[in-house]
Design a protein with these regions (language model features):
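Domain-level signal for soluble alpha/beta catalytic cores
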Residues: 1-277
Length: 277
């Protein structure tokens, strides 16, 4: 069962109202974790049944257990903390009020990352006609979170330069992939909005750099992704989904792929690309 299939999907789905209500109650201490997990299990089971019913060969949990598509994964590592944001992230017409996520020490992998348990539940639904796909933020997406202008000064409290960050980040991903592979994962997807920001007209301002600096960032993003991909088990299929952000049906960036194509399309060693067009 290899991906991509002739008809496929990225893997994130709109949350059912019952799940959104449950998460709000949980965050307000009106619902316990066990009760929230029970509702998540029920809604994921319904989603997987629908995916199979419609003839898809890939099954996902719709990212139903996450607060965001990417930050929850980062919060599962040592050295990372998060707190309620005051400003949010700018999307067109609206700011996404996602938790500020930042270093409080050097990155490290701790056993029992929550996503391993998430995948193990999904993996139970695999059979000879269906493969479970896990979506996680690409290493470049994680790196971007730590080296953007709003974060770099804090990051440099713990690292001398970006190359040091990459070394620890790659090690974290290698350990996570080893654990999720042992749990049965053979289809992993890197979700990656980092390239979308790089093609936007505002990229030089957003990254607070010049043209040469932007080219170096592109090189770093390819490097960190490939360092992880090249260290993964050979029978683990790794695809990537590249987009320009999506929050309440609005976008974070815009622009054609021309500026990043010589880097990501030519050199990134993924099995397949899922692309906006």
């Amino acid at each position: 069962m290899h991906t991509p299939f002739r008809y496929d999907y990225v893997g994130s789905f709109l949350r059912p109202e019952v799940l959104k209500d449950a998460r709000i109650k949980y965050e307000n201490n009106e619902l316990g974790l066990d009760d929230l997990t029970k509702i998540e299990d029920e809604e994921i089971t319904k989603l997987v049944s629908k995916q199979k019913e419609l003839g898809f060969h890939v099954i996902t949990d719709g990212e139903f257990r996450r607060k965001t598509w990417h930050l929850d994964f980062m919060w599962g590592f040592d050295g990372i903390k998060h707190s309620k944001t005051e400003n949010g992230l700018p999307f067109h017409g609206e700011n996404a009020m996602l938790d500020d996520t930042y270093l409080v020490g050097r990155l490290g992998y701790k056993k029992n990352h929550p996503f391993i348990k998430h995948f193990s539940f999904l993996h139970k639904f695999e059979d000879e006609n269906h493969v479970a796909k896990l979506t996680i933020p690409a290493p470049a997406q994680f790196l971007e979170q730590l080296v953007m202008p709003f974060a770099i000064n804090n990051t440099l409290k713990y690292y001398n330069n970006e190359d040091e960050v990459i070394l620890d980040l790659v090690e974290c991903y290698k350990n996570f992939i080893a654990d999720v592979y042992e749990a049965g994962c053979r289809n992993l997807q890197f979700d990656d909005c980092s390239w979308g920001l790089l093609v936007d007209d505002s990229a030089l301002r957003v990254f607070n750099t010049n043209i040469l600096g932007l080219e170096r960032i592109k090189q770093l993003f390819v490097k960190v992704n490939n360092d992880v991909i090249n260290s993964a088990p050979k029978d683990l299929i790794i695809n990537t989904h590249i987009c320009r952000g999506n929050f309440h049906s609005t976008y974070a960036s815009k622009g054609a792929y021309d500026g990043v194509a010589p880097y990501v399309f030519k050199h990134e060693n993924v099995n397949a690309f899922y692309l906006e067009y």
